[in-house]
């Protein structure tokens, strides 16, 4: 990896690049929800007598979990991956990359066949 390019730009799999970009995106309005969940649980454990601490902490946890659920539900690839045990993930990613490479090979072969029949395909000549 080069020192200037982000890992997301160097990932050959666009889905992995999108996941990386989603997980590393930061803004002032949207902070990471996992630390907030742990902080809310810490507040519950060390309650200092405030009456609505429990409700505040649990509502924060519920809100962050809803954000997480919505983010996962919006991506079919994430749903598929999360339906598998974590120890299977590297094998699944490897399999998906092999499938992509096989599709690229088929595409190259089809392009070669078309060029043999119709002549070279030129992007500038295409309508």
From Swiss-Prot:
Q: Does the keyword Nucleus apply?
A: yes
Chief site of localization: nucleus
Q: Name one GO cellular component term.
A: mediator complex
Taxonomically, the superkingdom here is: Eukaryota
Query: Keywords in UniProt for this one?
Result: Activator, Coiled coil, Nucleus, Transcription, Transcription regulation
GO molecular function annotation:
structural molecule activity; transcription coactivator activity
Kindly indicate whether the keyword Transcription regulation belongs to this entry: yes
Q: Which InterPro entries match?
A: Med9
Indicate the segments annotated as coiled coil, or none if absent.
Answer: 95-119
A GO biological process of this protein is: positive regulation of transcription elongation by RNA polymerase II
Q: Where in the cell is it found?
A: Nucleus
Summary of subunit composition and partner proteins: Component of the Mediator complex.
Spell out the family assignment given in the record's similarity comment: Belongs to the Mediator complex subunit 9 family.
- State what this protein does: Component of the Mediator complex, a coactivator involved in the regulated transcription of nearly all RNA polymerase II-dependent genes. Mediator functions as a bridge to convey information from gene-specific regulatory proteins to the basal RNA polymerase II transcription machinery. Mediator is recruited to promoters by direct interactions with regulatory proteins and serves as a scaffold for the assembly of a functional preinitiation complex with RNA polymerase II and the general transcription factors.
Supply the name of the protein.
Mediator of RNA polymerase II transcription subunit 9
Q: Which organism is it from?
A: Eremothecium gossypii (strain ATCC 10895 / CBS 109.51 / FGSC 9923 / NRRL Y-1056) (Yeast)
